[in-house]
Amino acid sequence: MFMKEEYDFCVIISTYNRPQLLSNLLTNIENEKKNHKILVLVFDDNSIEKYDLSKFNIKKITMNPNMGKKKYYFLINATFSYIKNIKSKYFIYLPDDVTLINNFFDETKRIYQSINHPKKICLNILTDDRVNRTNWTNFNSVDYGEYYQTQWNDLCFIAEKNFFEVLNYKIDKIHESRWVKNPNLSSGVGQQISVRLNKDGYNMYHTKKSMVHHGSHESKMNKLERTKVSLLTK
């Protein structure tokens, strides 16, 4: 039934063993939705901990088996396939361990709409010190006032349907050889998205002020790396 509806925002959240943080985020979304018509999709990576989401009007999809870091691309492909037939003006990807700023949906949409470049493809909404690095595309960020052009994506963003169309609704397989020399590397999904979109000439941006808050809690996929480099939002 919900696939026949038209939405202002479709929010996609991936989660693993964080029932309380997810519940906090879903409550946050409910409090921020105002008059917007919002569809929330939760992709659970086969969590061991018990979730009680009965009070929330969401659609929950559970992966089987657990994909973890090395097969995270498989979970993201599942999200891409699922939203292919969903009619929504905007799509927002969120991790399960963030909270939203006040007036989140209106502010995020406003800044996204203010970017007039024809090659705009996405606006990242989790901003930390990484915006000052070249990251995966060897691009020095450019300051445009309320946002930076950064040319990378780290799976916390707002976009329209063309983002997924350009990627053909598919993340290519990420081989386990990626982690042989460095087991602490990330899933590789954000890196692949960034490199592919940059190569095809599309522009990726970050808000100057983070639209979400991310604390110093333990990472589920990059525990050791997060002890060295924390994700503390601006």
Locate predicted features.
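Conserved short acidic donor-positioning loop in nucleotide-sugar-dependent glycosyltransferases
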Residues: N17, I29, F43-I48, M67
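Active-site-proximal specificity loops/subdomain of glycosyltransferases
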Residues: E49-K87
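Cell-envelope/extracellular polymer assembly enzymes that use nucleotide-activated donors
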Residues: D8-C10
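Short beta-strand/loop segment that forms part of the nucleotide-sugar
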Residues: K37-N46, T62-N64
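Conserved catalytic core of nucleotide-sugar-dependent glycosyltransferases
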Residues: I101-R178
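C-terminal catalytic/acceptor-binding lobe
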Residues: I13-S14, R18-L25, I171-K234
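Short, acidic, metal-binding catalytic loop of nucleotide-sugar glycosyltransferases
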Residues: T27-K37
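Short beta-strand-to-loop acidic/aromatic patch adjacent to the donor-nucleotide binding site
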Residues: K89-T99
